[in-house]
């Protein structure tokens, strides 16, 4: 008979404690412990469900054979880009995102578009008829895609073993449970053990498994933090529900570059890949407008240009307002302090509002120069000269530092027809400078206005 044990788990990080604690000693969060009843079976859940596996033996690195098909084309160029060129056989991939952002749509498109591959789509949230309706709306046909509405882990593993698919999609990990644990689906212990079982099965059979995870109100993936540690890839699906564009961002990738992004457009027929993000992030105005600047950014290995909008106005109240959309407010406050200290602009009595086009969330320090350029333009109510963009990081002393992969940013600006780009003067002399674009170098932020307003 199984030995029943009660334990308390932190909902934030999965830390286990024998009694309730007000504050988690692992992550430091308050009031996150919940009680769960766990039935301890002989052996781990993963070993019981997935079955016994042959013991591995140490091998020399040179003796290990690489798979002939090291990457699986999932049938979507943007997803392939974020994964580093395709899905690696035997990998466990976690996709997180807000409700309604399009996680299920993207995962179903991947399962249907993987031509030549046998796929199994496991849904714990929808019936087979509902999935069929969504598949018809997407307009993608794949006779090799199997639909399986199920939540019991043991049944799922049995079907995977019977059909031997190349790709399995689990929607979602919070709805899957095992009978070997007494806790409910979505609990810390259930998520941890189900993920560990799927990981063991993926590594032993070479089946790629794509699991969807819900997120909490603070934007992190629900469940124990160990879930993100054990998977090979963590993808974050971002976007504004009021905007048609979505970003797939690689947070963790054992087989490729991290923070690589893929851009999608949400249509009635599903998600469409956007191969050139710069085209949707830039707007061509009939007349020059103040408060608008263009920054050359680079996420992962992909450069793109994005429009930055700023509005600087007199503070109506004693304390000025500072508001941002898609940007870190603390970093904007730092840049405003640099402008006041190093350039002499009286920002302490100004309201400042900042927005990035397309509802994008950016954290690239190489966009500091573009943010400051938009603020300066709005402050003096003077439009930035036509065909000018910026790429550089600003330090607390007002110095302009080179942005990572500046050469790629310059090349992207030249490809899109920009006439001038403002970068750091500390960029090496050996840096490549493409033809057709003037590279203006500055060493400090007080030199920026002259570079922006010169026609």
Segments from the language model and where they lie:
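Peripheral, non-AAA+ core regions of ATP-driven protein-machinery
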Residues: 2-12, 16-83, 88-94, 101-112, ...
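Conserved SAM-binding strand-loop segment of SAM-dependent methyltransferases
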Residues: 147-148
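Conserved RecA-like ASCE P-loop NTPase motor core of nucleic-acid helicases/translocases
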Residues: 119-123
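P-loop (Walker A) phosphate-binding loop of NTP-binding proteins
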Residues: 98, 124
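Conserved Rossmann-like nucleotide-cofactor binding loop
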Residues: 127
């Amino acid at each position: 008979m199984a030995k029943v044990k009660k334990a308390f788990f932190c909902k934030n990080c999965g830390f286990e404690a024998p009694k309730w604690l007000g504050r988690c000693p692992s992550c430091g969060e308050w009031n996150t412990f919940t009680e769960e009843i766990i039935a301890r079976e002989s052996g781990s859940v993963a070993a019981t469900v997935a079955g016994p596996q042959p013991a591995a033996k140490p091998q020399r690195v040179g003796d290990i054979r690489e798979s002939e098909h090291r990457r699986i084309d999932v049938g979507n160029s943007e997803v392939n880009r974020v994964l580093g060129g395709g899905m690696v056989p035997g990998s466990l991939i976690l996709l997180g995102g807000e409700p309604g952002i399009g996680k299920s749509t993207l995962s179903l498109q991947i399962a249907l578009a993987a031509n030549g591959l046998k796929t199994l789509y496991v849904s714990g949230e929808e019936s087979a008829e509902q999935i069929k309706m969504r598949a018809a709306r997407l307009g993608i046909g794949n006779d090799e895609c199997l639909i399986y509405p199920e939540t019991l882990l043991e049944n799922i593993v049995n079907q995977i073993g019977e059909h031997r698919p190349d790709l399995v999609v689990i929607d979602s990990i919070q709805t899957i449970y095992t009978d070997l644990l007494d806790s409910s689906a979505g609990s810390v212990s259930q998520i941890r053990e189900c993920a560990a079982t799927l990981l063991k099965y993926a590594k032993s059979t070479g089946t790629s498994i794509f699991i969807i995870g819900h997120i909490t109100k603070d934007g992190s993936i629900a469940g124990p933090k160990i879930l993100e540690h054990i998977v090979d890839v963590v993808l974050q699906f971002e976007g504004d529900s009021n905007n048609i564009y979505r970003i797939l961002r690689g947070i963790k990738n054992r087989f490729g570059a991290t923070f690589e992004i893929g851009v999608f457009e949400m249509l009635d027929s599903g998600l469409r890949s956007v191969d050139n993000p710069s085209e949707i992030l830039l707007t061509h105005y009939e007349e020059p407008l103040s408060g608008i600047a263009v920054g050359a950014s680079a996420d992962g290995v992909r450069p793109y240009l994005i429009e930055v909008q700023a509005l600087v106005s007199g503070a109506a109240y004693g304390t000025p307002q500072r508001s941002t959309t898609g940007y870190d407010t603390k970093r904007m406050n730092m840049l405003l302090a640099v402008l006041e200290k190093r350039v002499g602009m009286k920002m302490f009595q100004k309201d400042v509002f900042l927005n990035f086009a397309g509802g994008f969330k950016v954290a690239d320090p190489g966009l500091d120069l573009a943010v400051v350029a938009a603020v300066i333009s709005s402050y003096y109510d003077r439009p930035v000269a036509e065909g000018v963009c910026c790429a550089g990081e600003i330090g607390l002393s007002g110095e302009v530092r080179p942005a990572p992969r500046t050469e790629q940013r310059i090349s992207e600006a030249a490809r899109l027809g920009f006439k001038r780009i403002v970068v750091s003067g500390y960029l090496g002399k050996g840096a490549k400078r493409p033809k057709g674009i003037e590279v203006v170098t500055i060493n400090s932020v007080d030199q920026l206005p002259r570079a922006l307003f010169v026609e």
